[in-house]
């Protein structure tokens, strides 16, 4: 058992009233990997992370973090795991240097060492100029960065990030991504991150698992999952649904799979670009006039649609919903 | 004890609490004092009210002192302990308030993710609260001195009364702390520190115990606060009456141990993983 692995076997979290927040989840995170745990709100992402980080107990099942059992060896897990939770828990009247120094000392560092480490980390997350300002006066992005620094104080081997970019503006989000990559590449940290952004999972993760309604729907490398859908697709939009249906029956034999999403016919096939002339000819033959025709690489959204039969939550809507909650916090 | 003072690396199992417990406790206490210093609004009103009580009681009843007390005895020294006890009770809420604050802003969970001892999470705010209680008591004693207080036991009398105030308030802190840990609610916690306020009046508040009669006398005799009050009065008015002081200490112990038993139980409730 490698020390930087996460092994989860048949993990279940049941709340009163027979609600299964996490329902028989198993997965493996390899040492030195960035593992994206993707799912819509309420899918069970945070519940999983609270169990893996020793804040709550599984109803049943097993989990090992860095070779330690999260149920019986919680104290050891806390030593090697760094955790940045979705709700940033920082005392608003304290200052960044104080919080980081205390955190270091609680992990057993001497006062001198933890001050040194704190300054190093403040430099790293670009907060060195703001050490005199109480954390309550920080912007959302600054607090998120400080929280990340808090998680890194004791040089963890495995880092847990629960929705690290939710509520952040695009620039801050890119900053967090760059930092996550750096920690993974330069420090060899295993990183487990949950996200509700498809783009983020796609961009950062070596491997992902999609969780929906407490169950893992699919697991694998983003590229592999997308490739599994039949590589690319040609999307032909028509003025109405009957026309799209007609086109599908005419074209379905030419492709791997044809699917109708509203008035758009999606044709999944290998080397889709080569097939465009044939598709256009066939449509001409039948005198079916498309409104538009596009070629797309599959996205994780398509993967999600395929494995769950529903579209992923609209990202924009989600950010807007989240924003006021963030402001209150 | 020698093991603690040796700076040699400890085995991994020992390292799970990296820092010696007493260092964790001092650090948590310091942290809470920093927070209290930056949010003084939660401490100042209780202090003002206690000083206000002292003025009012003294002004309204000191004229009757010749009749209530022995000749030449000061009503100020007689009523001062009431003010001190009410300050202890209102100051006892401080620890609970600051625990609830950490629970609400999420910092409590953050601390639970570190190897910090659970006992340090409880003792930090409680000891910070004790420092505040000592400060409050000292301020009230200072004001009383300006008003003409001359304790029968001199300077040591001040110290003894201060120690009583801190012990009583720290004991009572257990109640607000328990409510804070069990409910995580600020409203419930501030309510808890007022729950025992009636105890300061179900006793020989304004007149000596012998002047009471009927149900109030019975209530006062059962109320442990009465014995704390009498110990303080003896120290300020008459001198080192060890019997009264002994009863006072027993009363303080009873008033402190019960809340802290509950507080330890609540701490376990809050920090046990569910």
Each language-model region and where it sits:
Chain A
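Walker A (P-loop) phosphate-binding loop of ABC-type ATPase nucleotide-binding domains
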Residues: 40-44
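Conserved ABC ATPase "signature" region
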Residues: 101, 105, 112-130
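Conserved ABC ATPase signature
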Residues: 134-138
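Conserved catalytic motifs of ABC-family nucleotide-binding domains
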Residues: 155
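Catalytic Walker B motif of ABC-type/P-loop ATPase nucleotide-binding domains
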Residues: 159-162
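ABC transporter nucleotide-binding domain
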Residues: 178-270, 294
